[in-house]
Amino acid sequence: MKKITPYLLLALLLTGCYRDQGNYDYTLDSMNEIKSVTFIPSVVMTAEGEVIEVQQALDEQSCTRRIEATVEQTLATDLDALEFYWCRSYVDEQGKAVKDTLRTKGYMEFVLPVGKAMSYGIFLQIYDRTTDLSHYASFKVNTRPIFKNSLFVLHGSEGERQVGNIEVIGGETKIYTDVKVVTRDNNHYENVSGLGYTTFMNIPDDLTQIGVTNTLLLYASHGETKAYDPHGMDVKYTAEQIFKPVSETFAYHRTIQTGDPSNYTQYKVVLTESGEVYVGNYVHALYKPGMACENSADLPHQSDYTITAATITHNRFLLWDAKHGRFLYSSKDDNGFAIDEGNSIKPSFISSSPLLDAHVRFDGLQHSPATMTAVMGYINYRDNYDQQNAYFIFRDDASGDYYRYELLKLDIGDGSKAPQRRGAAAEVSEPLAAYSIVSEKRLVGLTPTHMSTITYNAWFTTSNLFFAEGGTVYRYNVSNGDKFAVYEAPEGYEVTKIKFRAEESSSFSDDLGLYLNIVLTDGTHGAVAEIKFTTAADVDEDYPTLFYDRDDAGHRWGEIRDIQFVYDYIYKMIY
């Protein structure tokens, strides 16, 4: 035993002194690895997690869909050694919860019901037989209503107008010069002259029916104005259910809309070509101001006017009456406005706030706007800020110059009991003004080809306006007159209209107001371009300039009359 012990100690000592040479050969380079898996259609991140959106089925022929997986591997170039397990969970048309597994290699087919929503929960295992390792992915497949977050395009000559659409789904763009190719509806769009849109959380009398509602307004002559569900173009309301009251001579001119639908502070003004005016809130209904007001001898309701420009402040609609060269105003807090869709069609809801003369004085100005052409009105901040001032831009037709006037709201109460100014002999003189012009500025360098292209967006500072001259869109600095080209049209095109996806930020609108849609014409056919800005109003160089001059079948746009981006109420949560 004593002889063995020294040998054991020597062996242990030699083992402890062994030097690791580091010559291991694990042959990792010879093992295949799944580096990434991507899908067509592509996955987007939403509040639900990763989701693939597919357009809803419109007929039996479009019910079966397919998702394809693209697998990037380090060694293999095919899918021969891979096994796919598509584990699915969903509720079928009979309301039964279903779980199944498909083993199709590289793709998964699934079925959608016609015209209905559908959702699949997917857990994908890709097993590599050469390594005995697996790669996993988890996502949802949701149906996407047609024309969701898309641009509607009204084009063609009056009497032959069509409604088209540009829709981006993942990496695919679908373009239709006629939506009837998709919707197969029998609607008449021939006399439509303008587009409008509202979306909000509708809270009806029956609280079990609470939900988001979306309404696309197609303004038309001959009493043909209608409100549609944009996701299918089903008629929701007729002219008699929209206008309070209906105008027999209605011809759409433009819409001014401000506020946040998520907190029910959105309001709008709709102007006609003949100077009629309608006002309203976030619901689709439109009211002639003061139709049910109690008239006052001291503050008479004004009904003789030609309204050509307007803006919306914290608590008022502020309008320019070109017929009498004056400003008018009306309260937004109108008890006659319906606050849900169901009640909006009832005859009992009608505007009760009078339209009043603001008695704004021009005698201290170098250039009175009374004889000028009103171009537009806007506000210097979001409309729920009660200290904002209003701005109106006018064009002097004699000189071609543009002027901006800033209006300060004066504290004379709520407007219904404005005190009268009295002279020394206790005789009534001019009533107090509701607004005062506090600044007058000539806008040097503002040279639009069409003055209707002058645009303001509340996403940016009040020093920035946008306008088009020829084929160029400019950002214009009101403070110093500098202008900077932000878009150049292709040769042969002229810009006729510019319109942001949204003109004011809201809780769920994310970056909608940074996208500018541009309408162009070559004299015969129209086209649509899109650019994106940064929050500093610079062009976002990371966003490609988009240009659409024909649909997927090669059909060209006619002359484009109007465009309207239709977005989801919770757009921010979806994209």
Regions found by a protein language model. Name each.
Residues 13-16:
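C-terminal motif of bacterial Sec signal peptides marking the signal peptidase cleavage site
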Residues 18-179, 505-511, 521-575:
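Acidic/polar, low-complexity intrinsically disordered N-terminal segments immediately downstream
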Residues 452-531:
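Extended, charge-rich low-complexity regions and/or helical-solenoid scaffolds
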Residues 174, 179-187, 201-453, 483-484, ...:
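Preference for solvent-exposed, low-hydrophobicity sequence contexts
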